[in-house]
């Protein structure tokens, strides 16, 4: 049973008033016990809400999997402000699951209700829709030192969508792919009311227009039309641990649960295992990664 005393505190009401830009995070997590708490840490203070979507014991193809402690990690996470929403639902499509939760968060359920004793302002504050959604997977970790600058950049530019670039890591946090060769890059922020067409793609026409207009020297024209921008690397990046796993077996299991199996033929694993990387000393990693609660195997010494 919830502690109703929290609903009578001034601090609770102030929480809903104090943040000018409201950001609600949407995180999809399936067997991510090693990452989920560390994903929440750098964003918690900057979000009005955080939805963790999981199917618990199924992947998006309806196949049974052995669940790990992901849900327990979410339930055990310190959440004094009641921001974290754990969503356990049987979905069969990644895009639809993300859009469904975004739509649910946007619905103001506080309208036209009669309360049972809770301050109406608190109910309205809880259901106040966000300005933006932060979209990330459970293995996309932001730098706690630079995430505020990313939010400030978002608030300044006011785009309809903003892509975030991320470093890729392989097996351990010390094996990083040079960003000059490749960066993990997806929409990290989308304006409330905008939904996805496929996975992290908002509108395929953006890339089509960019491709056509590149022929006349306007490669970003489609992005301009849709008011989509990229967050500059110097402002902030995230750290993609998609291939950081305890061993090769767990990496294979991770890849088999992806919703984009068509992009992972058998030779893909070998390509991952043979990737060139630069050794990154642990002291040069974000402080929240350095001090995170990780398995010992996630770090190595040169």
Task: For the regions a language model picked out, list residue spans one by one.
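Short hydrophobic segments within beta-strands
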Residues: 26-28, 53, 241
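Structural motif
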Residues: 24, 49, 132-134
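Catalytic-site signature of metal-activated, phosphate-bearing donor transferases
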Residues: 2-16, 94-103, 110-125, 131-135, ...
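Acidic donor-binding segment of Leloir-type glycosyltransferases
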Residues: 42-92
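N-proximal low-complexity "stem/linker" segments adjacent to membrane-targeting elements
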Residues: 1-45, 302
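Long alpha-helical, hydrophobic tracts
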Residues: 31-39, 52-60, 98
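Short, conserved active-site loop motifs that form the nucleotide-linked donor/cofactor pocket
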Residues: 23, 82-85, 159
């Amino acid at each position: 049973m919830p502690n109703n005393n929290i609903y009578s505190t001034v601090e609770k009401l102030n929480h809903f008033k104090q943040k000018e830009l409201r950001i609600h995070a949407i995180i999809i997590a399936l067997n991510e016990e090693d990452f989920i708490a560390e994903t929440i840490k750098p964003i918690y203070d900057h979000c009005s809400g955080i939805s963790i979507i999981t199917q618990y014991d199924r992947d998006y193809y309806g196949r049974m999997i052995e669940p790990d402690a992901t849900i327990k990690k979410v339930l055990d996470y310190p959440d004094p402000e009641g921001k974290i929403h754990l969503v356990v639902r049987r979905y069969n499509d990644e895009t639809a699951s993300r859009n469904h939760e975004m739509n649910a968060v946007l619905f103001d359920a506080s309208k036209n209700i009669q309360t049972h004793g809770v301050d109406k302002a608190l109910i309205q504050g809880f259901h106040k829709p966000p300005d933006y959604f932060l979209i990330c997977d459970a293995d996309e970790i932001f730098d706690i030192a630079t995430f505020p600058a990313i939010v400030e950049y978002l608030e300044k530019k006011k785009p309809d969508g903003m892509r975030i670039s991320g470093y890729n890591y392989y097996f351990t946090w010390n094996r990083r792919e040079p960003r000059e060769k490749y960066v993990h890059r997806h929409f990290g922020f989308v304006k409330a009311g905008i939904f996805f067409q496929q996975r992290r793609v908002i509108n395929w026409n953006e890339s089509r227009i960019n491709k056509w207009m590149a022929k006349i020297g306007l490669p970003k024209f489609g992005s301009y039309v849709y008011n989509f921008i990229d967050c500059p690397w110097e402002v902030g990046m995230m750290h993609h641990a998609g291939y950081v796993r305890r061993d090769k077996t767990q990496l294979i299991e991770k890849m088999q649960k992806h919703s984009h199996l068509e992009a992972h033929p058998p030779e893909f694993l070998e390509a991952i295992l043979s990737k060139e990387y630069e050794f990154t000393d642990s002291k040069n990693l974000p402080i929240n990664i350095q001090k995170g609660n990780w398995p010992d195997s996630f770090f190595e010494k040169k």
